Amino acid sequence: MGIHIPYLTSKTSQSNVGDAVGNADSVEFNSEHDSPSKRGKITLESHEIQRAPASDDEDRIQIKPVNDEDDTSVMITFNQSLSPFIITLTFVASISGFMFGYDTGYISSALISIGTDLDHKVLTYGEKEIVTAATSLGALITSIFAGTAADIFGRKRCLMGSNLMFVIGAILQVSAHTFWQMAVGRLIMGFGVGIGSLIAPLFISEIAPKMIRGRLTVINSLWLTGGQLVAYGCGAGLNYVNNGWRILVGLSLIPTAVQFTCLCFLPDTPRYYVMKGDLARATEVLKRSYTDTSEEIIERKVEELVTLNQSIPGKNVPEKVWNTIKELHTVPSNLRALIIGCGLQAIQQFTGWNSLMYFSGTIFETVGFKNSSAVSIIVSGTNFIFTLVAFFSIDKIGRRTILLIGLPGMTMALVVCSIAFHFLGIKFDGAVAVVVSSGFSSWGIVIIVFIIVFAAFYALGIGTVPWQQSELFPQNVRGIGTSYATATNWAGSLVIASTFLTMLQNITPAGTFAFFAGLSCLSTIFCYFCYPELSGLELEEVQTILKDGFNIKASKALAKKRKQQVARVHELKYEPTQEIIEDI
């Protein structure tokens, strides 16, 4: 339900308005009936502007907003500015991404430096796979229920619960002297990772203005890659320190404590407060998020959220959950959104990124590098830099475009790596990696270069786009839908973590990376035919696009139209008249 704004009174001449629209200049709209405090902004990206019949004394412009059930920037005086409060909420939530990345980064270094500290013996390949996969298993379990838990207990409480899981898991690992205690610690930490990996993007998407929702969600991915980079850096520094791996694990408690402390003083999202009937808190959060917005329109937004909340079927929590699951699978647009969300998360895992990161240390050793933790910084650093590139491009270039750039690039890099592995002659004997034949020394350099190329294309596309999953689903199935998608990611991670070393032994590194190249090629085809362009679209428009198909051409045309509208008119400033306020 959008706001109906009948007319905005202009003191600008008709010709000047026309020139402004054509030249993308701002047009000032003022009212003699209202105060400057109610000044707002509106962009043509989410509105159609129609010229109404002009009176003798003034021009009148009719603005017809596009309905959007969850777009704060449309409902709240069309204000696209980013407040310090929203920035604070985004960065605090994104600490979950940092902890996620740190967890995936430190285990690679820890497995190398553990030595005989567990059970007084060296870990076997099977034990390493179990320790690595335990976190993925824990994350898979909690991600299935995290979406529903977020609706029951709140996004904030779920994030704080994930902090407690991190603390328990880290303490068990730091104090571990047996393999099974280490594995249990990793499992419990995985519970926290699974909750945080789902709730943090959901939290950010619910407090972010639409025009920069993509960028703010990418901040979580940026912190994830930053966590990996920090973990590799710390691992390199502690590689030769006695019990350095315990210190490495213990350092994960620092961001956990920071996030938990900050969340104690910050609110939940407005949508959650509305779900619980606490309209006063919802109004308070919206006021702090959009400080230049009139109280009338904030109250209108709260009323709309109340209406949307009442539209969720079911009289109690179990019935609502069951009906939501049915609606997710039976409504065509929801089912297509689910296919896209789960498909992208599966692609992220089954194109070999985690596998390549795990093996990068051994690859670099074959060309003369001895500290595998240190050289892994090159790959994780590339991942971080190109995630930053995605941050600046995802809302401008578009989600679909960067995916169709990234996936073919990944396929090419994997093919080259497979060929290079074949000529380099690396094979596994079941216990350690052995260079059977070095072949041409240049093949090692080729592998290094294309591992970096792979990391760049991964970070640009499939490393970031799947976490935009919240925008695929309407409000009443978003929690369950994002749970499905995130669980798919962790199921894939579990499969890869528990089988990668076995694949290297059975089908050789060359065959393993050729397998990933084939999956990457199929993934490109999937995205080309099934993933529409969603950048700049209203949430209502996303559901319309997916109603009777994936409608790739229609989505591209609509996204192009939105960009043209923004190019024609940057913004319209206005002050609502009392007539408008009463009508709202």
Swiss-Prot record:
Belongs to the major facilitator superfamily. Sugar transporter (TC 2.A.1.1) family. This is Myo-inositol transporter 1. The gene is ITR1. It is a multi-pass membrane protein. Keywords: Cell membrane, Glycoprotein, Isopeptide bond, Membrane, Phosphoprotein, Transmembrane, Transmembrane helix, Transport, Ubl conjugation. It catalyses: myo-inositol(out) + H(+)(out) = myo-inositol(in) + H(+)(in). Residues 30-42 have a biased composition (Basic and acidic residues). GO terms for cellular component: cell periphery; fungal-type vacuole; fungal-type vacuole membrane; membrane; plasma membrane. Its main location: membrane. The modification Phosphothreonine is found at T12. There is a cross-link at K573 (Glycyl lysine isopeptide (Lys-Gly) (interchain with G-Cter in ubiquitin)). It is found in: Cell membrane. Pfam families: Sugar_tr (PF00083). The modification Phosphoserine is found at S26, S31, S35, S37, S46. Residues 13-42 are annotated as: Disordered. GO terms for molecular function: myo-inositol transmembrane transporter activity; myo-inositol:proton symporter activity. The keyword Magnesium does not apply. Glycans are attached at N371. PANTHER family: PROTON MYO-INOSITOL COTRANSPORTER. Major transporter for myo-inositol.
